[in-house]
Curated annotation (Swiss-Prot):
GO terms for biological process: endosome organization; negative regulation of defense response to virus; protein K11-linked ubiquitination; protein localization to perinuclear region of cytoplasm; protein ubiquitination; regulation of type I interferon production. It is a multi-pass membrane protein. This is E3 ubiquitin-protein ligase RNF26. GO terms for cellular component: endoplasmic reticulum membrane. It comes from Mus musculus (Mouse). E3 ubiquitin-protein ligase that plays a key role in endosome organization by retaining vesicles in the perinuclear cloud. Acts as a platform for perinuclear positioning of the endosomal system by mediating ubiquitination of SQSTM1 through interaction with the ubiquitin conjugating enzyme UBE2J1. Ubiquitinated SQSTM1 attracts specific vesicle-associated adapters, forming a molecular bridge that restrains cognate vesicles in the perinuclear region and organizes the endosomal pathway for efficient cargo transport. The gene is Rnf26. Keywords: Endoplasmic reticulum, Membrane, Metal-binding, Transferase, Transmembrane, Transmembrane helix, Ubl conjugation pathway, Zinc, Zinc-finger.
Length: 424
């Protein structure tokens, strides 16, 4: 057993020895192979490593060089900037000194100027106050005269419009009656002319029937007029009684009636039509005068007379006043614009001849006092702000009805802002 045990131990030792030898062999071979591999890798990577090292070395050198150059440049730029700031501060100080000098000289000049101006203002203050007081008094007097004239004109125009309205209403009421009587008369004349024999035979019954109709019509008309008169008197008495007994209620009823009447659009249309109808005769009469005077001015060279010469004037003016109703507004405006120029040209042409005769000089002076448009009325309206006294009241009203951009002075063509009536 001991021999077997020894054999087994010997075999184990041998195996252990072989294992150790194999491990040593593997360790040596693996170390040798690793060394060879590292050597080959080192040899293979040596150029790249050298180049990379040189590249990093060059890059570091360049960066350090650039940093050095940048530091030098910044130092130089900072020095130059500091020098420029110092120079600019010196220049600013010089400019401030210069500005102070200019300011001192300007202050001295302005103080001297203010002193001179104050002395002049103190000298001229009294004269200016006196002139302003005179101007204020003149303006106040002009405004008072203008207000009084405006009130008088408003009263006259209102009275004229009222009478024109009454005449128009009277014409509107009596016109249909007259036309009806004309139609009845024409109808009766036609019947009488077509049946003369029958009228002769039936004259007595027809006469009786006509007398009966006439008496009935007179009776009916008298009854109607009597009753209407009674109703009107009764209404007047009732109105007076109501006004005396209940003035507040009457005033309230009148106010309500007027408000309801003003609320109706037909009332405004009727009022506008009445105003237009009342203005129409005035406008036609004024345009007739303008047109007749323009025709008279145009016919002066053909007649060979002076302004105001009586040769055939009334007939021509009368015949010319019948036609201007159909003239368009453009022709009327053209007449207004050209009439003063023609009048002035004719007056200038006749001036040498008139200078030799006192009668002609007197006529020329009277013509100069006439309106430059119609040459019929005297100049009574002063145009502002040009201060030309060249128009009458009627022509001024016609001119002021035009748009604002057409309201120009006939002499200087400046815009008319205001008119002032002048009493010579």
């Amino acid at each position: 057993m001991e021999a077997v045990y020894l054999v087994v131990n010997g075999v184990g030792l041998v195996l252990d020895l072989l294992t150790l030898m194999l491990d040593l062999n593997f360790l040596l071979v693996s170390s040798l192979l690793a060394t060879l591999a590292w050597l080959l890798a080192f040899i293979y990577n040596l150029p790249h490593t050298v180049l990379t090292s040189l590249l990093h070395l060059g890059r570091g050198f360049l960066l350090s060089l650039l940093a050095l150059v940048e530091a030098v440049v910044r130092f130089t730029f900072g020095g130059l900037q500091a020098l420029g700031t110092l120079l600019y501060s010196c220049y600013s100080g010089l400019e401030s000194l210069k500005l102070l000098g200019h300011l001192a000289s300007h202050g001295a000049l302005r103080s001297r100027e203010f002193l001179n101006r104050g002395i002049l203002n103190m000298v001229s203050n009294g004269h200016a106050l006196l002139r302003q007081a005179c101007d204020i008094c003149a303006i106040a007097m002009s405004l008072v005269a203008y207000v009084i004239n405006s009130l008088v004109n408003i009263c006259l125009i209102s009275t004229q419009n009222f009478f024109s309205l009454v005449l128009a209403l009277w014409d509107a009421v009596t016109g249909p009656l007259w036309r009806m009587t004309d139609v009845v008369a024409a109808f009766l004349a036609h019947i009488s002319s077509s049946a003369v024999a029958m009228a002769i035979l039936l004259w007595t019954p027809c006469q009786l029937a006509l007398e009966l109709l006439a008496s009935a019509a007179r009776l009916l008309a008298s009854c109607v007029v009597f009753h209407l008169t009674g109703l009107v008197l009764l209404a007047c008495v009732l109105a007076v009684i109501l006004i005396v007994l209940h003035p507040e209620q009457t005033l309230r009823l009148a106010t309500q009636a007027l408000s309801q009447l003003h609320a109706r659009p037909s009332y405004h249309r009727l009022w506008e039509d009445i105003v237009r109808l009342t203005r129409l005769p005035l406008g036609l009469e004024a345009w007739r005068r303008v047109w007749s005077r323009s025709l008279q001015l145009a016919s002066w060279p053909n007649r060979g007379g002076a302004p105001g010469a009586p040769q055939g004037g009334p007939r021509r003016v009368f015949s010319a006043r019948i036609q201007p109703q159909d003239t368009p507004p453009e022709a009327e405006e053209e007449v207004i614009r050209t009439a003063p120029a023609r009048g002035r040209e004719q007056l200038n042409e006749d001036e040498p001849a008139a200078g030799q005769d006192p009668w002609k000089l007197l006529k020329e002076q009277e013509e100069r006092k006439k309106c430059v448009i119609c040459q019929d009325q005297s100049k009574t309206v002063l145009l502002l702000p040009c201060r030309h006294l060249c128009l009458c009241q009627a022509c001024t009203e016609i001119l002021m009805r035009h748009p604002v951009y057409h309201r120009n002075c006939p002499l200087c063509r400046r815009s008319i802002l205001q008119t002032l009536n002048v009493y010579l």
